[in-house]
């Protein structure tokens, strides 16, 4: 890659130097310099940086000034293909396009490369250079101003274009343009060098106080001074960029480290929050399950109480009803107390406690309270079974008393036994269908039975025939319901298998 760049550079020089010979009258000095350049090619590092610095102002010279030479165009086109910072030819346009791309990207390499104008000026600057020490100091000051302005060119691209036009004015007389342009640019840059002109062989430059009559020695001194100043500037610019880059890298590392810490903390906090949510959800599910079991057991106890009440109302006489009701009322507050204890357990389990120790303590309390509630449930169930046994014994006593009364009444006793049996069968069949209907029908049956008892005690044999018709009709109705339920099955489901018939 470097060899290709050197070949392109030599080809551009070979095309540019004959044009410079025709425009300049100092043929001797220019021929000697071309011989030196053809004999020894410039070093690659300084020459490449100075090549790119020369390419951008000459590329703008093509758009701003119409009287630029072919050498400037060819150099601007050839140098626009190479960037030492990138290593590959990223832009194939002119120098102005490359400068705009680098200004947009915010790269500082272009400003550093523009500072190295010295080596090329010292080697083949042409006869129109400023040869006195005063002019050299003025040009160094102007070049320093241009470097400072070029460093600020990233923020203001319009200012960078103006200063690049001034740099182009410095490079145009060095490349060997027309004598009038070189005179105007030298007067603007040199700071009042009136006696300078590009005519003659260098003897007219003595008016400005040259130290020697030899133009070659003064030019070489100027070239060395500019090379040293350019090297110092490049080192300073590199020194300025290096600490800023290191500081930026340190700041970025610290920001990344802090962001990682905050990210880890957020992860830890999220995991803790998820753990708390899972604990709270598990406790809520446990409390809900306990509530569901409590509600189921309460519903069971209520259904058992209802059945006990219905049986006691159907079979027991009026004198023994208050005793069974009092026993059932005594069983209800125990169940209410158990439900209240369960509600307290659920409220305790649902309380959000952030500490793990308090959570563990609450869980243990909730487990112990659940065990207590289960014990209370078992005790309530045993009480309900005892109440059922008491009610059954009361029913048996009532049946025995009724049998004694029936023995005294004669036929009425047998009729009352049939009524009690029919009422019990009807209540059982109807309870299996629906609880609400069973309650209403049991109440009506109990009222009918009490009325029939009163009528049997008062009327005697006249009412016995009517009471015989009623239980027979009710038994027939219950049998019809059972038969209808059996015959209303679909035809395909007569067998107990789940499969359809025929397969």
Swiss-Prot record:
<keyword id="KW-0539">Nucleus</keyword>
<dbReference type="GO" id="GO:0005576">
    <property type="term" value="C:extracellular region"/>
</dbReference>
<feature type="region of interest" description="Disordered">
    <location>
        <begin position="23"/>
        <end position="503"/>
    </location>
</feature>
<keyword id="KW-0732">Signal</keyword>
<keyword id="KW-0964">Secreted</keyword>
<dbReference type="GO" id="GO:0030198">
    <property type="term" value="P:extracellular matrix organization"/>
</dbReference>
<feature type="compositionally biased region" description="Acidic residues">
    <location>
        <begin position="203"/>
        <end position="215"/>
    </location>
</feature>
<feature type="compositionally biased region" description="Acidic residues">
    <location>
        <begin position="493"/>
        <end position="503"/>
    </location>
</feature>
<dbReference type="GO" id="GO:0005737">
    <property type="term" value="C:cytoplasm"/>
</dbReference>
<feature type="compositionally biased region" description="Polar residues">
    <location>
        <begin position="407"/>
        <end position="418"/>
    </location>
</feature>
<dbReference type="GO" id="GO:0070173">
    <property type="term" value="P:regulation of enamel mineralization"/>
</dbReference>
<feature type="short sequence motif" description="Cell attachment site">
    <location>
        <begin position="350"/>
        <end position="352"/>
    </location>
</feature>
<dbReference type="GO" id="GO:0050840">
    <property type="term" value="F:extracellular matrix binding"/>
</dbReference>
<feature type="compositionally biased region" description="Basic and acidic residues">
    <location>
        <begin position="293"/>
        <end position="303"/>
    </location>
</feature>
<dbReference type="InterPro" id="IPR009889">
    <property type="entry name" value="DMP1"/>
</dbReference>
<feature type="glycosylation site" description="N-linked (GlcNAc...) asparagine">
    <location>
        <position position="394"/>
    </location>
</feature>
<dbReference type="GO" id="GO:0031214">
    <property type="term" value="P:biomineral tissue development"/>
</dbReference>
<protein>
    <recommendedName>
        <fullName>Dentin matrix acidic phosphoprotein 1</fullName>
    </recommendedName>
</protein>
<dbReference type="GO" id="GO:0001503">
    <property type="term" value="P:ossification"/>
</dbReference>
<dbReference type="GO" id="GO:0005634">
    <property type="term" value="C:nucleus"/>
</dbReference>
<keyword id="KW-0963">Cytoplasm</keyword>
<keyword id="KW-0091">Biomineralization</keyword>
<feature type="compositionally biased region" description="Basic and acidic residues">
    <location>
        <begin position="233"/>
        <end position="243"/>
    </location>
</feature>
<comment type="function">
    <text>May have a dual function during osteoblast differentiation. In the nucleus of undifferentiated osteoblasts, unphosphorylated form acts as a transcriptional component for activation of osteoblast-specific genes like osteocalcin. During the osteoblast to osteocyte transition phase it is phosphorylated and exported into the extracellular matrix, where it regulates nucleation of hydroxyapatite.</text>
</comment>
<feature type="glycosylation site" description="N-linked (GlcNAc...) asparagine">
    <location>
        <position position="356"/>
    </location>
</feature>
<feature type="compositionally biased region" description="Low complexity">
    <location>
        <begin position="138"/>
        <end position="150"/>
    </location>
</feature>
<feature type="compositionally biased region" description="Basic and acidic residues">
    <location>
        <begin position="158"/>
        <end position="175"/>
    </location>
</feature>
<feature type="compositionally biased region" description="Polar residues">
    <location>
        <begin position="54"/>
        <end position="63"/>
    </location>
</feature>
<comment type="subunit">
    <text>Interacts with importin alpha.</text>
</comment>
<feature type="compositionally biased region" description="Low complexity">
    <location>
        <begin position="332"/>
        <end position="348"/>
    </location>
</feature>
<feature type="compositionally biased region" description="Low complexity">
    <location>
        <begin position="419"/>
        <end position="435"/>
    </location>
</feature>
<feature type="compositionally biased region" description="Acidic residues">
    <location>
        <begin position="98"/>
        <end position="119"/>
    </location>
</feature>
<dbReference type="GO" id="GO:0031012">
    <property type="term" value="C:extracellular matrix"/>
</dbReference>
<feature type="compositionally biased region" description="Basic and acidic residues">
    <location>
        <begin position="467"/>
        <end position="492"/>
    </location>
</feature>
<feature type="signal peptide">
    <location>
        <begin position="1"/>
        <end position="16"/>
    </location>
</feature>
<feature type="compositionally biased region" description="Basic and acidic residues">
    <location>
        <begin position="267"/>
        <end position="286"/>
    </location>
</feature>
<keyword id="KW-0272">Extracellular matrix</keyword>
<dbReference type="Pfam" id="PF07263">
    <property type="entry name" value="DMP1"/>
</dbReference>
<feature type="glycosylation site" description="N-linked (GlcNAc...) asparagine">
    <location>
        <position position="457"/>
    </location>
</feature>
<feature type="compositionally biased region" description="Basic and acidic residues">
    <location>
        <begin position="23"/>
        <end position="35"/>
    </location>
</feature>
<dbReference type="GO" id="GO:0010811">
    <property type="term" value="P:positive regulation of cell-substrate adhesion"/>
</dbReference>
<feature type="compositionally biased region" description="Acidic residues">
    <location>
        <begin position="362"/>
        <end position="373"/>
    </location>
</feature>
